């Protein structure tokens, strides 16, 4: 097995971390909105920004995996 394939597989694992992080953040945001419904818009804004940043790391990992495999 080529080391490039292993490296690409490891790069794709960033999606796993992003998925776990977004799941935890969404759960906590839901709890926070349930406790303080009047702050829902601020919590939702922070959640969307954080989820976007977390998802960006997964996309970067996928791009790097494609770059490694097509080299």
Curated annotation (Swiss-Prot):
Q: What is this protein called?
A: ATP synthase subunit c
Site (Reversibly protonated during proton transport) found at 55
Location of the protein in the cell: Cell membrane
Please name the InterPro entries in this protein's record.
Answer: ATP_synth_csu_bac/chlpt (IPR005953), ATP_synth_F0_csu (IPR000454), ATP_synth_F0_csu_DDCD_BS (IPR020537), ATP_synth_F0_csu_sf (IPR038662), ATPase_proteolipid_c-like_dom (IPR002379), F/V-ATP_Csub_sf (IPR035921)
How does it sit in the bilayer? Answer: Multi-pass membrane protein
List the NCBIfam families.
ATP_synt_c (TIGR01260)
Assembly: F-type ATPases have 2 components, F(1) - the catalytic core - and F(0) - the membrane proton channel. F(1) has five subunits: alpha(3), beta(3), gamma(1), delta(1), epsilon(1). F(0) has three main subunits: a(1), b(2) and c(10-14). The alpha and beta chains form an alternating ring which encloses part of the gamma chain. F(1) is attached to F(0) by a central stalk formed by the gamma and epsilon chains, while a peripheral stalk is formed by the delta and b chains.
Among PANTHER family, the record links this protein to: ATP SYNTHASE LIPID-BINDING PROTEIN, MITOCHONDRIAL (PTHR10031), ATPASE PROTEIN 9 (PTHR10031:SF0)
One GO MF term on file is:
proton-transporting ATP synthase activity, rotational mechanism
Q: What does the protein in this record do?
A: F(1)F(0) ATP synthase produces ATP from ADP in the presence of a proton or sodium gradient. F-type ATPases consist of two structural domains, F(1) containing the extramembraneous catalytic core and F(0) containing the membrane proton channel, linked together by a central stalk and a peripheral stalk. During catalysis, ATP synthesis in the catalytic domain of F(1) is coupled via a rotary mechanism of the central stalk subunits to proton translocation. Key component of the F(0) channel; it plays a direct role in translocation across the membrane. A homomeric c-ring of between 10-14 subunits forms the central stalk rotor element with the F(1) delta and epsilon subunits.
Q: Which UniProt keywords apply?
A: ATP synthesis, Cell membrane, CF(0), Hydrogen ion transport, Ion transport, Lipid-binding, Membrane, Transmembrane, Transmembrane helix, Transport
Q: Which HAMAP family match?
A: ATP_synth_c_bact (MF_01396)
């Amino acid at each position: 097995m080529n080391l490039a394939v292993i490296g690409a597989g490891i790069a794709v694992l960033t999606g796993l971390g992003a998925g776990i992080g977004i799941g935890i953040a969404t759960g906590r945001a839901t709890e926070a909105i349930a406790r303080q419904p009047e702050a829902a818009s601020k919590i939702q804004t922070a959640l969307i920004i954080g989820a976007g940043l977390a998802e960006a790391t997964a996309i970067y990992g996928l791009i790097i995996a494609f770059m490694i495999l097509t080299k």
